[in-house]
Amino acid sequence: MERIKELRNLMSQSRTREILTKTTVDHMAIIKKYTSGRQEKNPALRMKWMMAMKYPITADKRITEMIPERNEQGQTLWSKMNDAGSDRVMVSPLAVTWWNRNGPVTSTVHYPKIYKTYFEKVERLKHGTFGPVHFRNQVKIRRRVDINPGHADLSAKEAQDVIMEVVFPNEVGARILTSESQLTTTKEKKEELQGCKISPLMVAYMLERELVRKTRFLPVAGGTSSVYIEVLHLTQGTCWEQMYTPGGEARNDDVDQSLIIAARNIVRRATVSADPLASLLEMCHSTQIGGIRMVNILRQNPTEEQAVDICKAAMGLRISSSFSFGGFTFKRTSGSSVKREEEVLTGNLQTLKIRVHEGYEEFTMVGRRATAILRKATRRLIQLIVSGRDEQSIAEAIIVAMVFSQEDCMIKAVRGDLNFVNRANQRLNPMHQLLRHFQKDAKALFQNWGIESIDNVMGMIGILPDMTPSTEMSMRGVRISKMGVDEYSSAEKIVVSIDRFLRVRDQRGNVLLSPEEVSETQGTEKLTITYSSSMMWEINGPESVLVNTYQWIIRNWETVKIQWSQNPTMLYNKMEFEPFQSLVPKAVRGQYSGFVRTLFQQMRDVLGTFDTAQIIKLLPFAAAPPKQSGMQFSSLTINVRGSGMRILVRGNSPIFNYNKTTKRLTVLGKDAGPLTEDPDEGTAGVESAVLRGFLILGKEDRRYGPALSINELSNLAKGEKANVLIGQGDVVLVMKRKRNSSILTDSQTATKRIRMAIN
């Protein structure tokens, strides 16, 4: 009580009130706040206050021998007074200026190498062009973007091992460099940094920038590749944007872009083959992008795109848990559903079997040009809030959401039959049938949907069936918003499974991706994509198929030759001859094949008629299922360069030209490689010279295994027997001599014996 009285008494005095309201009361608290702990509480103020002093810097005593006491203007650079509490010298900021101008210069050769990413950025900005500034509302959506251009794609752990190996090679610690990219990077960097004086820690930081992809979740309206993100602060504000064209590319963006193109091409091609999954894997493993194996890029590159994710799933890698429909990425943000098969009738009374999602769910939909929030119940769209770049993009998003909702009025809006097929001529599943139908023409869908009057809500307006905005009415449940919907931020990856038709499912069996979702957009890759698989030969058109087919035969001629003489059927069935068939007119494929196979059989039967160039030239024609018509051809037609061109059965033509003197083959004027004829072509009896040291025992004997080529004979042990393929495609049984002395006589007897053995 006493205290309270005392306080009341004090408060009655006006001075007390003034002190308490106008002045800082507890100085101790404030002093404590700014002095406790090592952390500087107001760094900007501290800096200003320090720099106002004459000697704000302290330095080691040795500095006095390296810097004069006064500069050219006679200003003092350091004080003779010691710094209180340490044996350091107090130094003026002017000393820094003096040092920068007159101090020792070390070698700068390593700077561009260490600060590579910075030097490259300067070049890009120097050559970039900034356009006009436009003031307009910016629809930004947060996306996961790559923020440092010019990096490799190592994982944090891989990069850490490389950095330790480069910067601290003698430190103890288990480091295992396994991947190709780790080994090449380590080797390169060690060479670059010999004799480097820059502090190891700095080098380590800079290497990290170069090796690891750094991503941030940032609001973006416009380009998302790293060369745009590095100038994000210059190109878009809340209500303005500035046009910008980068002055150069960064390899990481090129890799991402080329990877997407390669993956799309591969998925599209795999879809039409007999076993899509096996074909896809074969192509991924045999493709290189910018000289790096595609499978290595897939393992390290976090790009999320439908085709890329299908390739990753095929390789057993984890992918994002969101799913794709109609080119939009759907992510369920709340609710749940169970799936049930249901039969529905279209407006054309066609029956469709659809998998209905029963239950209330909310999704975000993110596309390249539009985003949306979708709330739905069983076969009912409750609300759809869309934002997009333009009318077209908004319409696309609305169509996808309406189809996804599976509402009855959408299914009843179908006019005509649904019979869309994929590239392999298989019918699409019902949901994609509906989607394709309305993507072609959505008029009936929008007209049938129904409209409602709307309340005035900030930032939202209605949209009518003809896609015009309105503040009074809107299509039922649909609203247009000025605000974009952020991409799903989590980078969580899940285990998925893939079936042979390339449908990717999560562990609960939900389909996340299928080839129908792969974009048909064509683009030109920034980095060279080398598809070694014969399945991709046709990607560059008929000429490429032609050249590649002949190059493949030449490269594998030794094996092809043996198969040609021993097991032709197996040879004709090789997948490498598949693309070639599309060049041969359908009507004559079978006749050409029958004719060429008969011709080859005669070559095998008649001594001295083996002709390397002719076999190579005609071989691809023999791959089609043959028709025995007994027809003879002097030339065969193939469709290249937009018309039928003739290839002569005997002799050269513009398509296939073998130059006997240079021993090179040109296909359509392009060099297809060196072609070595058998030494005996056109000259009988040369086999005898080749078979010196071997005794010819007679006709081929299957018990001694498949025929060897003459080059493989050298591996035989003395006294060992083998079948051997000699010049004219004939096979004889030989034995390697036990003594060398009799080799000379071999040549004479060989010729006679071969004739006897064959006849």
Curated annotation (Swiss-Prot):
Annotated effect of mutating residue 10 to A: Complete loss of mitochondrial localization
Recorded consequence of changing residue 130 to A: Complete loss of replication. No effect on transcription
Listed GO MF terms: RNA binding; RNA-directed RNA polymerase activity
Example GO biological process: negative stranded viral RNA replication
Domain of life assignment: Viruses
Main location: virion
The keyword Hydrolase is assigned to this record: no
Sequence motif: Nuclear localization signal, positions: 736-739
Site (Mammalian adaptation): 627
InterPro entries cross-referenced by the UniProt entry: Flu_PB2_2nd (IPR049110), Flu_PB2_6th (IPR049114), Flu_PB2_C (IPR049115), Flu_PB2_CAP-bd (IPR048298), Flu_PB2_middle (IPR049111), Flu_PB2_N (IPR049106), INV_PB2 (IPR001591), PB2_helical (IPR049113)
Effect seen on changing residue 49 to A: Partial loss of replication. No effect on transcription
Effect after changing residue 7 to A: Complete loss of mitochondrial localization
Effect of residue 447 to A: Loss of interaction with ANP32A
A GO CC term assigned to this protein in UniProt: virion component
The keyword rRNA-binding is annotated on this UniProt entry: no
Effect the entry attributes to changing residue 738 to Q: Complete loss of nuclear localization
Entries under Pfam families matching the protein: Flu_PB2_1st (PF20947), Flu_PB2_2nd (PF20948), Flu_PB2_3rd (PF20949), Flu_PB2_4th (PF20950), Flu_PB2_5th (PF00604), Flu_PB2_6th (PF20951), Flu_PB2_7th (PF20952)
Compartment(s) where it occurs, according to its Swiss-Prot or TrEMBL record: Virion; Host nucleus; Host mitochondrion
Known outcome of mutating residue 450 to A: Loss of interaction with ANP32A
Stated role: Plays an essential role in transcription initiation and cap-stealing mechanism, in which cellular capped pre-mRNAs are used to generate primers for viral transcription. Recognizes and binds the 7-methylguanosine-containing cap of the target pre-RNA which is subsequently cleaved after 10-13 nucleotides by the viral protein PA. Plays a role in the initiation of the viral genome replication and modulates the activity of the ribonucleoprotein (RNP) complex.
Similarity comment: family membership: Belongs to the influenza viruses PB2 family.
Subunit structure: Influenza RNA polymerase is composed of three subunits: PB1, PB2 and PA. Interacts (via N-terminus) with PB1 (via C-terminus). Interacts with nucleoprotein NP (via N-terminus). Interacts (via N-terminus) with host MAVS (via N-terminus); this interaction inhibits host innate immune response. Interacts with host ANP32A (via C-terminus); this interaction promotes viral RNA synthesis.
Protein name as it appears in the record: Polymerase basic protein 2
